[in-house]
């Protein structure tokens, strides 16, 4: 009889997207049990696009500096063949993603108040990122050599 009581929230209206330390985090509620006061969030983590872009731009500028010292320098190109092309390659080489579930227990609060759940969930996610995934930039160490 228990499964009748617990209802599952399938719509993503309470999905949250935030960035933390260079990671893009997407979290959404997959189960919300009224009776136990527990809410389960599915969490997807990836490297945020602007990190890829920043690293790609650094590589592009470094290449341009090298080119300038050569006899026939090519023009600085920030178009598709430049930064975006490098960005695409970066994503292929360092495509990081992780998914996991976290459970947040309701504390004394208004029953349907979303805020405390989301706050607690974000707190948990941030500490998981701190302890488990480390610094985004470390993933791009020595990347110039392989691109």
Predicted regions and their residues:
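Mixed-charge, Lys/Arg-enriched low-complexity segments
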Residues: 56-147
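Negatively charged, low-complexity tracts enriched in Asp/Glu with abundant Ser/Thr
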Residues: 4-39
């Amino acid at each position: 009889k228990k499964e009748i009581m617990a209802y599952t929230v399938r719509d993503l209206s309470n999905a949250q997207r935030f960035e933390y330390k260079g990671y893009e985090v997407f979290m959404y509620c997959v189960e919300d049990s009224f009776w136990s006061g527990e809410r389960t969030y599915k969490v997807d983590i990836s490297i945020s696009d602007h990190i890829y872009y920043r690293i790609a731009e650094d590589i592009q500028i470094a290449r341009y500096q090298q080119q300038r010292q050569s006899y026939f320098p090519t023009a600085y190109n920030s178009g598709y063949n430049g930064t975006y092309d490098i960005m695409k390659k970066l994503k292929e080489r360092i495509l990081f993603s992780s998914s996991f579930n976290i459970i947040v227990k309701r504390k004394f609060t208004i029953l349907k108040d979303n805020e405390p759940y989301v706050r607690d969930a974000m707190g948990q996610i941030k500490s998981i990122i701190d302890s488990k995934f480390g610094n985004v930039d470390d993933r791009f160490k020595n990347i110039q050599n392989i691109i």
